[in-house]
From Swiss-Prot:
Membrane topology: Multi-pass membrane protein
Region ranges (Disordered): 1-25, 592-611
Molecular function GO terms recorded: siderophore-iron transmembrane transporter activity
A GO cellular component entry from the record: plasma membrane
Residues with glycosylation annotation: 62
Protein name: MFS siderochrome iron transporter C
Gene that encodes the chain: mirC
Role played: Major facilitator transporter that contributes to the maintenance of intracellular siderophore ferricrocin (FC) levels. Plays a role in conidiation and confers protection against oxidative stress. Also contributes to fungal virulence in the Galleria mellonella animal model system. Does not appear to play a role in either siderophore export or uptake.
Major subcellular site: membrane
A GO biological process held by the record: cellular response to iron ion starvation
Length: 611
């Protein structure tokens, strides 16, 4: 059964086996139907339901897909995913050197907190932007923001500029991530979605190995700045095929009169701004962004503040953040303040959705205590790995989790169940974390360390995709997008909390332990060693200073792993709380009845789906 079949509709015909027809015949038939008004009832009903402009566009575009154009679109998605994946694997190894260039190596966690905060809050509004303005337009905005972030990082002269650039970078990259998943949801059903949703992840199987090598070459022959700046050229080039695919099919839909001309907005500029405010739920977005940012960022900044937790600015940020967090559910529950809420809180009344989102939170928090953000630095300093080797070890998680997720997506398709894989994934993930604790001491062999990452990666791959699928299955058809956004937001929130707490532990313990263990004549270098990984690596392995540095790193990393072991305690109980749906009995039904074809006619793309 093919995964892609344009004739039966982008959302519901992906597994039907039907007779092949040429693209030209399909387009001629579609033109005839448009000319005779065969689709008028469907399009009119959509308009009368006040569906947002971006949704109307993609529904019209869905009617114009041919087999060739749909395949090109998916190939384009893969091409762009390959570039973003390679970029991610390359620049991951550059972060330590970029922050060290500003003598702020410890602020890696703060940078990651900024990234995770943006990742957590940007997914729901980015999906709404795509619905309000259109998929093509949203992709273009994401690419532009992405490029601006990389230009700013490459040109940054201090850690503040570098950290602020993460806002643009994270917003752009997260926008691309959610838009790719929205596009895939437009052309897949529930059983095949687990497999097709992995399409953007498949490049990791290759890029995970070549990314660190590219980073090593960039550092040796150029600079970390060029390692960031080159992607501002490569990424837009990789986006061109997808952009042309969407643009040409959008123009085809206009030519066939499937996209009606926009009516002039009523009420003037103020009315347009008011509608946009409610469409995007800007109030909810502001409260969510403020709550997450003002609570998590101070956790890593307190250690570098002059008065620590007693600093007035730190206390003020946390108090305001807590106020925004308390106000958020009241705002989102108000029909007057948020008629189109950013977060569908009522979904959390579903046991499976609540358990799945909570599981994702703790799973990703444990990841940011263990694999990110300081495992890479630990491998270089304590184990003596070079840039490429340390990068490959840390990226083993991405490689093995992708393979495991691919395997489990195929098994889900044929077993039509998902919960058993969630439970198995949680157990394997816990075993991997325990192995990381056992092998975290100096002198562990490369094979031992590699095995821990393989096991953790398999566990992550086994549980991640099935949990997302379970959360989606627990929601109604109209709420699938909201359920997906809440799942991804919960996961990013867990990562943000993990990164913030790991940064607080790191910045509190490393300087103190360096002053405790360094030889008397080197105690004055503690701040320099803490601030720059290159300074720590400058002392040869086995020297008294390096022994002291390694001891400080090992003891601090042990504390992070203890936090990871605490975070994974709820995983198995939460997996058991999820309902074991039989997925083939929960297939989504189209919102609009298909147009019947006359005998002997070619069936066009019949179903119109709202995302």
């Amino acid at each position: 059964m093919p995964f892609l079949d344009h004739r039966t509709g982008p959302s519901y015909g992906t597994i039907d086996q039907m007779e092949q027809h040429s693209d030209d015949e399909g387009e001629r038939f579609l033109q005839e139907q448009c000319d005779t008004g065969r689709f008028s009832s469907d399009i009119t009903s959509i308009s009368e339901d006040s569906v947002q402009e971006g949704v109307r566009k993609i529904e019209a575009i869905n009617l114009t897909w041919t087999a060739r154009s749909l395949v090109i679109a998916y190939v384009s998605i893969f091409l762009m995913s390959f570039c973003t994946s390679l970029e991610g694997q390359t620049v991951m190894s550059l972060g330590a050197y970029a922050t060290s260039a500003f003598s702020k190596h410890s602020l890696i966690s703060t940078v990651l907190v900024v990234q995770n905060v943006v990742n957590a809050v940007i997914k729901p509004p980015m999906a709404k932007v795509a619905d309000v303005f259109g998929r093509f337009e949203a992709f273009c905005v994401s690419i532009l923001i992405y490029v601006l972030g990389y230009i700013q990082m490459a040109a940054s002269t201090n850690v503040q500029t570098y950290a602020s650039a993460q806002i643009f970078y994270s917003a752009g990259s997260t926008g691309l991530q959610i838009l790719q998943q929205v596009f895939i949801a437009d052309s897949s059903n529930l059983l095949n979605r687990a497999f097709l949703a992995l399409l953007p992840e498949f490049p990791f199987l290759v890029t995970v190995w070549i990314g660190p090598t590219i980073a090593d070459a960039v550092l040796k022959h150029a600079s970390w700045r060029w390692g960031y700046g080159m992607w501002s050229i490569i990424l837009p080039a990789s986006f061109l095929p997808l952009a042309l695919s969407l643009l040409l099919n959008q123009r085809k839909a206009r030519r066939l009169n499937l996209i009606k001309p926009k009516s002039r907005p009523r009420g003037g500029v103020f009315a347009v701004l008011r509608r946009t405010w409610y469409d995007l739920d800007m109030g909810g977005l502001i409260l969510l962004s403020a709550a997450v940012t003002l609570i998590l960022v101070p956790l890593t900044l307190a250690a570098n503040s002059k008065n620590g937790w007693k600093s007035d600015s730190i206390v003020a940020m946390i108090v305001v953040g807590l106020f925004c967090l308390i106000a958020l559910p009241f705002w989102e529950s108000s029909k007057r303040l948020a008629p189109k809420p950013l977060l569908s809180l009522h979904l959390l009344k579903q046991r499976t959705a609540l358990a799945g989102c909570t599981l994702a939170f703790w799973y990703f928090m444990a990841f940011y205590f263990s694999v990110q953000p300081y495992f890479y630095s630990y491998l270089q300093v304590v184990q003596g790995y070079d840039v490429a080797t340390a990068g490959r070890v840390t990226q083993t998680f991405a490689f093995t989790s992708t393979i495991a997720a691919f395997a489990v997506s195929i098994l889900i398709k044929y077993t039509r169940r998902y919960r058993a894989f969630v439970i198995a994934g949680c157990v394997v993930y816990i075993i991997g974390m325990v192995l990381m604790m056992v092998t975290r001491h100096e002198g562990s062999t490369p094979a031992q360390i590699l095995v821990t990452q393989v096991v953790v990666g398999i566990g992550g791959g086994l549980l991640n995709v099935p949990v997302q699928l379970g959360v989606q299955a627990s929601a109604s058809h109209q709420e699938v997008a909201a359920a997906t956004a809440m799942f991804l937001t919960s996961m990013e929130m867990g990562g943000a909390v993990g990164a913030a707490l790991s940064g607080a532990v790191w910045t509190h313990n490393i300087p103190r332990k360096l002053r405790l263990y360094l030889p008397e004549e080197n105690k004055g270098d503690a701040d320099a060693i803490f601030g720059k990984i290159t300074k720590a690596l400058s002392y040869p392995l086995g020297s008294p200073v390096r022994v002291a540095i390694n001891q400080a790193y090992q003891e601090t990393f042990k504390k992070l792993l203890i936090l990871a072991l605490i975070a994974i305690i709820p995983l198995v109980p939460l997996s058991l709380a999820m309902e074991d749906y039989k997925l083939d009995k929960m297939s989504e039904e189209p919102l609009v009845d298909p147009v019947p074809a006359e005998e002997g006619e070619i069936e066009p793309n019949r179903h119109v789906k709202r995302t």
